[in-house]
Amino acid sequence: MTKVKICGLRSLADVEKVNRYLPDYIGFVFADSRRFVTDEQALEMNRALDRRIQAVGVFVDEPLGHVAGLCDRGVINAVQLHGGESESYIRELKQNTGTTVIKAVRVQRAEQVSRMISQEADYMLFDTYKKGAPGGTGERFPLEIVKESFVRKPYFLAGGLDCGNVAEVIRQTECFAVDVSTGVETDGVKDEEKIRRFVECVRNVKRV
C-alpha cells in the first residue's frame, strides 16, 4: 500500500488532526518557509504525536550538526533534504545517527532523473521544479518525468497533490509514498476534513 506523508505541521492542533487519521509520516519544516517551526516547537509536537507516525525533519543545506542533534534528541525520526547536500554529507549523517534519509530533487526533464539519484539516501522525493523554490509550491508534478524514467530507488512524489488527483497519480506511477501539504490546507491552515479525505483516498487505491 502506498504510504502517506502530511508535511508542514505547525501546531498541536495539527498534530491532533493527523493523530485521528494516522498517515505514515508527517513533516516538520526547519527551512525558511511559512511553515517553519523551531526545534522546541517540533519537540513539543513530536511528544504529542501518535507513535505509529514517523516525524520527518525537512531541511535545506542545514549544518550537519544541527540535523544530527535533532535526530539524537528524538525530535525527528527521519530526515528530508531539499538543498544541495552532497553524497558525503548524507553518508556522514547516516553514519552518525543511523537515521533514514530522503533526498528531494526538483526535476524538469526525464533525462535528468538518473544523474540526480542519490546512492546514499534511502529514498528519493520528486517535487515540482519552480525557480527559487526548494519545495512546497503546491504546483502539480509532471508525471511523465517518472513514467519515462527507470527509478531503481523507492521514491516519494510531491507537488500539487490532493484528494482529487492522488489516486490517479498512484495508479500511473510506482511511487512508494505521496507527500502533501498545500492540498490538505484551507487558507494556509491544515484542514482536518481534507486530511481525512486524502488519507482515505490513498488507502482506497488498488494498483493493477
What do these predicted ranges mean?
Residues M1-V208:
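Conserved N-terminal beta1-alpha1 strand-loop-helix module at the mouth
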